[in-house]
Amino acid sequence: MSLTPHGGVLINRVNEEYDLSTVAKEIELDAISFADLELIAIGGYSPIEGFLTKADYEAVVSSMRLASGVVWSLPITLPVTKEKAAEIHQGDIVRLSYNGTVYGVIEVEDQYTPDKEKEAVNVYKTDDRNHPGVKKLFERGDTYIGGKITLTKRSEKPFPQFTYEPEETRRHFKENGWKTIVGFQTRNPVHRAHEYIQKTALETVDGLFLNPLVGETKSDDIPADVRMKSYQVLLNGYYPKDRVFLGVFPAAMRYAGPKEAIFHALVRKNYGCTHFIVGRDHAGVGDYYGTYEAQELFEQFTSEEIGITPLKFEHSFYCNTCEAMATPKTCPHDKSEHVILSGTKVRTMLRNGELPPSTFSRKEVIETLIEGLKTTVS
């Protein structure tokens, strides 16, 4: 399979020589839009070249496609307050700043008032304000600004040694001779169930791209710096160094379940992956989505439309009788013999000061997490 970016071309909207002297108006971004700005500019969100215009937004919300017909499952928008929107007009070029520093500009093509109730139900499958993605949606501005962006300044990265743009990951894969690469998305520490499906996938491809999300997440998720230490410990001790590549994904978590799974796959395609692991309740939260709903959503599109192969894994567990990791496909034993692993369960145990058993996670990983969380709390 070729490593063609989504839409056919890897977008590059970076111009650090851009003359800002004549640009007066300014929009202050939140953490989500700031991460999106950079990811649009470096091609992570190809074929998108800016924050969605009304036509693209409505097409994505209603049909999971851009107005051009290209598959795209999540609306990437720039929300502003009504007061800020009143200052901005079609044709304006507006600075985009974060924490007082200008990082880019947007060429305003339009501004529009979204139907947030419809967006919530169509994207998140609920309008329940207790859902973290829905809550965030309604907290943000009520007017959306659409238009192409230019990144005029790259930000300082929290994990510079693990930060790669799509052009760089593609080059790395090529230099290593990898023709097939499987991407793995996570916002959790890697537990034994993750390790099992990653290594099972690695048996069939040339390389694994471990691409943990380090943008904005829920307050009860394990902090990114603690997770990054745990990934390094795990990879150094239990994975072949020449078959795995660790790089961060700086986007915010949307918790949009099935539609975010499609989005995660398309983005990893842009980073150069040919395959993408889709496990149980991918990008889910609480009980809002079915266990395998994300996997089923991929069936709505042809392989040509998606352009990346989903590797669908059933719920894996540790079987006391098998004395090994397994899934319902490979283990005949009763559920009473199964130790169910999940990131939520590991997080809860760690927060409560409990030591998860070795069937949950590698000893070195647990030690790293406990030490990291102590530092975070203190």
From Swiss-Prot:
What protein does this entry describe?
Sulfate adenylyltransferase
Q: Which Pfam families match?
A: ATP-sulfurylase, PUA_2
Q: State its Enzyme Commission number(s).
A: 2.7.7.4
Which reaction is this enzyme known to catalyze?
Answer: sulfate + ATP + H(+) = adenosine 5'-phosphosulfate + diphosphate
Q: Which InterPro entries match?
A: ATP-Sase_PUA-like_dom, PUA-like_sf, Rossmann-like_a/b/a_fold, SO4_adenylyltransferase_pro, Sulfurylase_cat_dom, Sulphate_adenylyltransferase
- Record pathway: Sulfur metabolism; hydrogen sulfide biosynthesis; sulfite from sulfate: step 1/3
Q: Which family does it belong to?
A: Belongs to the sulfate adenylyltransferase family.
Q: Which organism is it from?
A: Bacillus pumilus (strain SAFR-032)
Q: Which domain of life is it from?
A: Bacteria
